Amino acid sequence: LAEYCRKIGAPIVPPVPIEDIIEKHLKLGIEFDDTHRLFGVPRSGLGLDPDILGAMFFDERRIVIDTSLDPEENPAKEGRYRFTLAHEGGGHWRLHSHLFAKDLAKASFLDEAAPPSVVCRSSQAKEPVEWQADFYASCLLMPRKLVMAAWDEMFPDRKPRVIAPAVPVEHPFVELPRIECRIGNFDCSETDDNVLDGVARPLAGQFLVSPIAMRIRLEKLGLLHRTVPHQRIIAGGG
């Protein structure tokens, strides 16, 4: 981001212009295609959602994103599209090009002339290069400084939020109520994720990312908590 800011001579404001960064600054091509057809892998799962979200062709300097994530065709997928783009072009390109650019067969399962160096599948267990690219994408789209500023604007008290504990304890956070509901033996209470997503959603809209991505980022930054950290209980009570 610092490189891009110097290049354009202006500070970054949310949402981070990820397409400009990828295409104009990093000089990478962005293409949409049916990734499952392209790689000969059948779609599966509920609604036949894509398992292959994107692929990085290092030697060709291009990124292929599944057509289902095209924000012009599916505006509701814009957050996921931007994260996939940041994952491929930000994470893999900046972190892993030295691993794959000269060894096209290293991460390929294809026998074609120009296979992708990295194929990202949502169903597979995260390998180190994948969670590294995820974290890079998260920091790129939701920079700590910008997220903290947006949080302070949304919550002038600047305090982190925590899901209200079942047993009251003294702590310095602001508690988030949870809707409790039970029908017979069926517990239909709000999940932790739903409670935290409700806080993350406005910021997700500001940064053009999914509520899930923003919620994870806010948890990593210590602004959202599922339980009161033990040290905070002591600090709050002392």
Tell what function each PLM region has.
Residues L1-G238:
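Active-site hotspot residues in diverse enzymes, especially metal/ion-binding acidic/histidine motifs
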